[in-house]
Amino acid sequence: MKASIRVKLETLVERYEEVQHLLGDPDVIGDQNKFRALSREYSQLEEVTQCFQAYEQAQEDLVAAQEMAQEDDEEMREMAQEEIKDAKEAIERLTDELQVLLLPKDPNDERNCFLEIRAGAGGDEAGIFAGNLFRMYSRFAEKKGWRVEVMSSNEAEHGGYKEMIAKVSGEGAYGVLKFESGGHRVQRVPETESQGRVHTSACTVAVMAEIPEADLPEIKAADLKIDTFRASGAGGQHVNTTDSAIRITHLPTGTVVECQDERSQHKNKAKAMSVLAARIIQAEEARRAAAVSDTRRNLLGSGDRSDRIRTYNYPQGRVSDHRINLTVYRLNEVMEGDLGCLIEPVVLEYQADQLAALAEQN
């Protein structure tokens, strides 16, 4: 292990012990915001501290086994060789784990997020598939213990949605779901298809971190165009007799957000503003990322329609992730919210790319 890495790890262990002490301080316990922030930091430091302690123990075990290998007793030497082998394997495994734990963290990873699903090409079937995707993510969130709140929805005439925006609240929601941004394509026989032909439809998914109020960009009132209208359901029928729905246009960027799910115009405006701010920040971050480098694979989808990341093929019961050439024949389980088999391999590839980038820098 490099000396610089060891110094960094020792610093993190010191901070872990300091935070552990602070959490027992009555002044901290009495300040809920500070206590919550330190508890979050403690849980983040705990994993790397335990991993480093296990690494140090494996190093000690290796030294002890190497000393045992010098014994005169043949049986002891054989036992020592086994222990040397085990210790070296543990050191190698723990070194890899520590490298991943030391990768730069996205400060947004622990935050809640906005999940935006839009029907694309494919007519009615695209809207139905948008509904399927929302159900899939809702089931996944339920399994993770997260909460899903509909922010805005525009129902399609024959089921599903033209557009759906939901807020997903829970620890690490953005860090997990951010890999879902991009184009999602479905291949299946629509219920209305009498000839049994397979149709291809598409939806786009965009995942944006919810930004704390203190970190929100300043949005000038003069830069906003705010329209009010009556909320409507599928087929255009009115479900509200007052102009409670809100459409906000950010004139400098052309970003538009609609919200009509609340009966109160004030609540719809508040929801729309939070989504608008998240969209503006995401667009700026995407622009910066594109300017920095286009040479390395971007496993974080843009949410753009042309950025196809996944295909769901119903006749074959398969789901393919085009970013990492992964195919799994577990379509039914995936649509019921078992997304781990798709998300985890992408996360591992993303970490491998980060490690490769760090190696190039060094």
Swiss-Prot record:
UniProt xrefs under Gene3D superfamilies: 3.30.160.20, 3.30.70.1660, 6.10.140.1950
Any one GO CC term of the record: cytoplasm
Pfam family membership, one: RF-1
Protein biosynthesis listed as a keyword: yes
Keyword tRNA processing carried by entry: no
Keyword vocabulary terms for this entry: Cytoplasm, Methylation, Protein biosynthesis
SMART domains reported for this sequence: PCRF
Cell compartment(s), UniProt: Cytoplasm
PTM (free text): Methylated by PrmC. Methylation increases the termination efficiency of RF1.
Record-annotated membrane-spanning stretches: none
GO molecular function: translation release factor activity, codon specific
Sites bearing N5-methylglutamine, chain numbering: Q237
PANTHER family tied to this protein: LD18447P
Function: Peptide chain release factor 1 directs the termination of translation in response to the peptide chain termination codons UAG and UAA.
NCBIfam families documented for this protein: prfA, PRK00591.1
Family: Belongs to the prokaryotic/mitochondrial release factor family.
Protein name: Peptide chain release factor 1
